[in-house]
């Protein structure tokens, strides 16, 4: 009987995406299956490629800022920040204190909102409809704050070379204080509904293992790296802006599984709230823009700068030839690099567990495809 069974089994090729709702964008996986067990994964990317690096060569330095919003569009202030700080580093610009604090507030709000989308979508991938609704409900409050600040809710475009785009209106600060007061209780609510669920735990614990050694060898960054036992965060390792003034911890977990890659984001959200509170307390009065020339022409040279994006390390490499337009722009996208570990976390698991494991990487295809 066993011989008959073995003769009747064959490898199945399954296409997942690019329209699959669990692909978090136009991403496609060619999955090899033996029964329900995954034996191989071939990622297929590029469906959202827009040639941003090439576009940058035909735009002036300020003109390219809105394009960066379209990288990780769930955390656009981080993309803005990485780019403008790279140009400022090339120019040797000193940024006003108030602008530095506003940048931190916007960036950490974006990190919080990005993780809210992660929690909601990861829960929905396992049919957790209730856990999906709560984070999206509260994320609206952050989008309201972005709208007050910039007029836009998603592609915020709030950073400028030399500072920020606008002074927050008077109603921004009470709304922010109310948000900070309410969120600890809301986070506990998300945790109990999602991470406390026995079915979710059974589908995530000891599944999708990404060991410390493999994570380091593949240059994985962000929450996926910290959930594999590596306490590394650019904000601490190489502080940019004024992050060195803030008291916060870099969460680290050692389970190396899908569960820990979810849990680490809850821990990071608490740290983001802590940073925002300190920024609101300490923000000084003063200008929000440095004195910059109307036509920005950084000196000829090259520069690389990186920030801690919610998805991983985001870096910009810019080559300047002394004209108003860059000669070359290279973007190091954390979500793109992190996809390298897909076979590591997926092969050997069941097809239904692959969905949760892939979701735990929190890949956004705008950043992957550029």
UniProtKB/Swiss-Prot annotation:
Record localization: Cell membrane
GO CC terms: plasma membrane
Cell membrane is among the record's keywords: yes
Catalyzed chemical reaction(s): a quinone + NADH + 5 H(+)(in) = a quinol + NAD(+) + 4 H(+)(out)
| GO terms of molecular function | NAD binding; NADH:ubiquinone reductase (non-electrogenic) activity; quinone binding
Q: Which leading EC class covers this enzyme?
A: translocase
Q: Report keywords, A-Z.
A: Cell membrane, Membrane, NAD, Quinone, Translocase, Transport
Q: Which InterPro entries match?
A: NADH_Q_OxRdtase_suD, NADH_UbQ_OxRdtase_49kDa_CS, NDH1_su_D/H, NiFe-Hase_large
Broad class of where this protein is predominantly found:
membrane
Name the EC number(s). 7.1.1.-
For the keyword Manganese, the answer is no
Membrane topology is: Peripheral membrane protein
Task: Give the function comment from the record.
Answer: NDH-1 shuttles electrons from NADH, via FMN and iron-sulfur (Fe-S) centers, to quinones in the respiratory chain. The immediate electron acceptor for the enzyme in this species is believed to be a menaquinone. Couples the redox reaction to proton translocation (for every two electrons transferred, four hydrogen ions are translocated across the cytoplasmic membrane), and thus conserves the redox energy in a proton gradient.
Name the family: Belongs to the complex I 49 kDa subunit family.
Which HAMAP family does this entry report, sorted A to Z?
A: NDH1_NuoD
Q: PANTHER family recorded for this chain?
A: NADH DEHYDROGENASE [UBIQUINONE] IRON-SULFUR PROTEIN 2, MITOCHONDRIAL, NADH-UBIQUINONE OXIDOREDUCTASE 49 KDA SUBUNIT
Q: How does it assemble?
A: NDH-1 is composed of 14 different subunits. Subunits NuoB, C, D, E, F, and G constitute the peripheral sector of the complex.
Protein name from the UniProt record: NADH-quinone oxidoreductase subunit D
Q: Which species expresses this protein natively? A: Desulfitobacterium hafniense (strain Y51)
Record lineage = Bacteria, Bacillati, Bacillota, Clostridia, Eubacteriales
Gene assigned in the entry? nuoD
